[in-house]
Amino acid sequence: MQNKFSLPTQDEIVKRLKKIPEGLWRECSNCHEKFYYRRAGVYEVCPNCGYGARLGSRKRIKLLCDEFEEWDKAMATDPTNIDDEKYKKKLATGIKTTHVNESVLTGKAKIGNNEFAIGVMDSRFIMGSLGQVTGSKIARMFQEATRQHLPVIMFTASGGARMQDGIHSLMQMARVSDEVARHSAEGLLYIAVITDPTTGGVTASYAMQADIIISEPKTLIGFAGRRVIEQTINQKPPKDFQQAETLLKNGFLDDIVERPNLKEYLNNLLNLHSDK
């Protein structure tokens, strides 16, 4: 009987591989395990270690909020005032990738019966850097939340101050911090949800000024980068350095919440602090 099966040639294997759609298999950036993309689910969480992949601001709001009304949608960095061509290209790429005008999306949202102001930073937009317009949008969000007597939930994700904006970027730390203080003085709740990565000036200001500070698992949280610290102290920090779990253990965080549980967790906090 003639064998009908024959091994494919190298050329045939290459042709077959080209027909396989891209993105079916993913590699976790935390544990580096490979897995079939559907196993991550709608929340984009690694099935092996529980690390949540970096989400865009619009997707995060879609997963979290029952209703959302965007504020300051038209606010954006004006490219005509920029001489740096590389910066212009980065802005254009950020807008194309994220479908937002800046590294933060702000607005009024609702979970269940609870209304609140929300800000979501997008690490895909120039690494979520804190630029002049970013700071303006966040400051205006706190101002409007104070005016409407709303709690604030802020999702941070940032590489720090935006170098291209110079001193104007650094000024946003003080500007936003001032509005956080005004909001707090009115007895209003501020919850910070720190997501991967949150570093630099954002960590040094409004990310750590909230009444309740929580984080997703295995989030990188710090000020200076690991390499800078190593060069400064001439020592290698431990592996768990600048990890959310280490910060929780040392009292810098109030809790670590897995992404699929965030909506219910935040709704419970809003219920507990509601004045209705």
UniProtKB/Swiss-Prot annotation:
Keywords, ordered alphabetically: ATP-binding, Cytoplasm, Fatty acid biosynthesis, Fatty acid metabolism, Lipid biosynthesis, Lipid metabolism, Metal-binding, Nucleotide-binding, Transferase, Zinc, Zinc-finger
Keyword check for DNA damage: no
Start and end residues of each CoA carboxyltransferase N-terminal domain: 24-276
Cofactor(s) this protein requires: Zn(2+)
Identification of the protein by name: Acetyl-coenzyme A carboxylase carboxyl transferase subunit beta
Localization annotation: Cytoplasm
Chain sites annotated for binding Zn(2+): C28, C31, C46, C49
Binding note for cofactor: Binds 1 zinc ion per subunit.
